[in-house]
């Protein structure tokens, strides 16, 4: 009984240590720049992404979001599909687009913030962009997912 209890406690501690969340803090500003262009997580890891628009301008003039795309998604083609989706914060709702997105924040104006949580997908490189019209050309980066 004592050995079983020790084994269960050890397994619980190991599981807790290996399940550590990845905490990512991204900002976007009125100069259309993210503070970081790349970050790294491990497949299967819980990712908590905090995004803050540190500029002053409102969302209608200089809105920013973070959209993490599936590996292999063509960024310019995806961004083009976002432009007409103003009513949804420039997030397209068609099924193909939904399959191309891993996660996304809300569209934010100056001083606003959002937090999203998702599970890191399989190992690979996943682009992230701002889908406000025209921003993707400058506001983009890569989430690298490492194998376990």
Locations of regions flagged by a protein language model:
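Sec-dependent N-terminal signal peptides
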Residues: 4-13
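Sec/Tat signal peptide C-region and signal peptidase I cleavage site
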Residues: 13-19
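Extracytoplasmic/periplasmic copper-protein system
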Residues: 20-27, 69-92, 119, 123-125, ...
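N-terminal edge beta-strand
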Residues: 21-47
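Extracellular/periplasmic metallocenter environments
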Residues: 52, 99, 103-148
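Extended, low-complexity, turn-rich repeat/linker tracts enriched in Gly/Pro/Ser/Thr and Asp/Glu
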Residues: 55-59
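Short Gly/aromatic-enriched secondary-structure transition segments
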Residues: 61-69
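Short beta-strand and strand-turn-strand segments in soluble, beta-rich domains
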Residues: 90-102
